[in-house]
Amino acid sequence: MTQDYKATLHLPATDFPMRGDLPKREPAMLERWEREGLYAQVRANAAGRPLFVLHDGPPYANGQIHLGHAVNKILKDIIVKSKYLAGFDAPYIPGWDCHGLPIEIAIEKKFGKVGVKLDAAQFRQKCREYATEQIDLQRRDFKRLGVIGDWDNPYKTLDFRFEANEIRALAKVIDNGHLTRGVKPVHWCFDCGSALAEAEIEYADKVSPTVDIAYPARDPAAVAAAFGVTLSAGTQVAVPIWTTTPWTLPASLAVSLGAELDYVLVEGAADHGQPRWLVIAEALAGKALARYGVDAVVVHGHAKGAALDQLLLAHPFYAERDIPLILGDHVSDDDGTGAVHTAPGHGQEDYQVSKQYGLLERYSAAQINPIDGRGVYLPSTPPLGDTVLAGLHIWKANDVIIDALRDTGALLAASKMEHSYPHCWRHKTPIAFRATPQWFISMEQANLRADALKAIETVHWYPSWGQARIAGMIDGRPDWTISRQRTWGVPIALFVHRETGEPHPRSTELMRQVAERVEQGGVDVWYTLDAAELLGDEAGDYDKITDILDVWFDSGVTHETVLVDRGLPKPADLYLEGSDQHRGWFQSSLLTGVAMDKVAPYKQCLTHGFTVDEHGRKMSKSLGNGIEPQEIMRTLGADILRLWIASADYSNEMSLSQEILKRNADAYRRLRNTARFLLGNLHGFDPLQHLVALDDMVLLDRWIVHRAHELQEKITAAYARYDFAEIVQGLLNFCSVDLGSLYLDVTKDRLYTMAEDARGRRSAQSAMYHVAEAFVRWIAPVLSFTAEELWAYLPGEHSGNVLFATWYDGLAPMPADAALTSADVDKLLALREQVAKVLEPMRANGAIGAALEAEITVAADAQTAARWQPLSDELRFLFISGDVTVTAASTDDIFVSAQPTTKAKCVRCWHHQASVGSDPRHPELCSRCVSNIEGPGEERRWF
């Protein structure tokens, strides 16, 4: 009768749950972290270490967090936690962007615009309350992601101290000579009723009209003479322009040509029966004439654009307005006609070239910019013959103007085209350039552009292409419009002279005095401030500016208002945001940092891509492909979301779908099961009593510690360069290959069958202990909840949190001068694979049921055989096979053969051994098992 030897085996035992059950366990951990003040404890534990400051770019305090928020915050959290483990003190102060239009719009929907139900002060208070509510909602979800930080003391741009520090920061920018004021064309949103910064613009397709308009020459003979041609009597000459913005024609003050472009004087279609010749860029003449219905290109003369400089044309419908031909570098012969209608109030290049020619002094502000902030023509806008423009919105005016031009004969061609056009990022509506009085941070006045380009070169950019991208943006960007004509924001706290419009000569001193008051009472102080308090008798000569600062200035100065204010080093070690922030926060921070201190405010800058579905499509409600982080946490847990983010290539678009989440859940189970197996086999192990020194370990145990050391070197280096996908891949590979397919499988025999305190068993447990200690740290930045859970189950003293620890220092490489090196083990593992290939067909044809039923013969060259023969008694444990014989052969290759064993099977260890039944007390056991149960136990050196 078979005895039950199960009680003599040391099978795995642990209370560490097989199932993560993360949606239930994670909230309980969060409550404990909150109760114990985990962030404060981690900071206190790290006191005195070198600082690593990842400065948080503030999300906007409006609406629930979405998947992009989760990606951003979790990437930051992974870095912060990895820095604690790397021996740094890594403070993380989350922040929120609280001023600006989206919040104003939310309040307007409820209470109407300022002056309807609320005055400006009441309106600002409602904005403040709304933003505070939104912060609380977002903070709850950010914490649920497992992100640690100073959540009780975040920075908020609406805090009085922040607002005051922002005014002080602006004063510093002014002191350094970067502020300017002017009437310039700026991006303008008619729905916002305000200027927009570059970062507030996004491009979308728009269908626009295209028109070719003839500008008749005042003196046709003079134009012809420039081409070396004499005109016949009655022949007209005109310069056609091509535009997609007919609404700007009332503001047309010149036509620009390219000085070095080649132009031709060609025959066009007759105008009211009279011949009309046209001036067109030579490269475009054929295409243009085809649009006008003229088949043949009849050229009468050639000239450079420079030959036509300052010749006069007539406006196509304001006949009394002289339109000079001028020369501009922005003109090309890529498309159109090579002649560009120039409206300085509605284009930056138009403005610059008109300024060079002195055109701005010849016209009134209403002629330069005839539209108001709503996009409607001013009452003073002259009509087009009988067509009234005053009061008409520009988007409706296009067709009206085209019809009027058709009636006058000035319209040569009209069509429509779809093209990429700037839109307001908030309203998703088309915007326009509009010349208005604004405050700017000049890119040239105090060399800001050049200094910023130099500063970019001092920063480490991840990915590296980020450097060229932001440099190109800085190189080509216009002055920064920092003024906004809105209510909810930080005021540009300047006094300007009523007659000259110049800021007070003591402006920055006065701003700092205003900041003291704002720090006590918030921005409302500015609007209630009696100027006489600061200006005394001068008060009657000055007006307070009512414009507020661009919200990108709010967030752009956080290196001063947050880092410096809280005693943290500047520049920060790292800024990390989405790739759209090269034109947003990275850029506004760079410009303010350089404007204030001549240096970039960050040492490293890292960008991540946007989230898309498995087909590469942007996630949206309309497509039904959106996945919210709240849903993932509710169904799978935050650690699964964190694992996906870490495993994705965040430098590009990040794909997510239910199938991808399922794959990550499977990967999580593999990691968790590995941890559970390690813990199960560490049952009864006390590192203080049972730890076997590395040099005394069984060879395979020493090798797995060596492999763990190699992996830790790679993992810590990958964390340092923010390559989290390599970490996840390395972990999964280690769990599947090194541990799952090899080490854990091979060591089961020792762990289960040897005496509890046998050196071979304690050696395996010691190796597993080292691996587990390292493993919990490796996963902690990514799988924060699971690492915390695992930490509590590890043998030995593990109080507090894994983040109190640093990278595990119990690992070491195998000595290069050891009797058997890691290279020797690698050769034996290759032999193990060779054995498996030999056994596979034997299993398939039924010759054996399991590898333990096969006896192996290895034939190798004499030197290799001599090296392996001392191991041959234990090779069966490495191969998990029957007995192994190593023989020398005259060959350079290694040959493996196998045959089914005829030996009896031990019911306890399942090995087939000749010694089974040799002890009458245990007729079904091999001698090894008998010794392990009752005797001194077996010894292992190798496997």
From Swiss-Prot:
Residues binding ATP, per UniProt: 621
Motif 'HIGH' region boundaries: 59-69
InterPro entries for this protein: aa-tRNA-synth_I_CS, aa-tRNA-synth_Ia, Anticodon_Ile_BEm, Ile-tRNA-ligase, Ile-tRNA-ligase_type1, Ile-tRNA_ligase, M/V/L/I-tRNA-synth_anticd-bd, Rossmann-like_a/b/a_fold
PROSITE patterns: AA_TRNA_LIGASE_I
Cofactor binding note of this UniProt entry: Binds 1 zinc ion per subunit.
GO CC terms of this entry: cytosol
Binding residue positions for L-isoleucyl-5'-AMP: 577
Reaction equations catalysed: tRNA(Ile) + L-isoleucine + ATP = L-isoleucyl-tRNA(Ile) + AMP + diphosphate
Quaternary structure and partners: Monomer.
Protein name: Isoleucine--tRNA ligase
Source organism: Xanthomonas campestris pv. campestris (strain B100)
Lineage, highest ranks first: Bacteria, Pseudomonadati, Pseudomonadota, Gammaproteobacteria, Lysobacterales
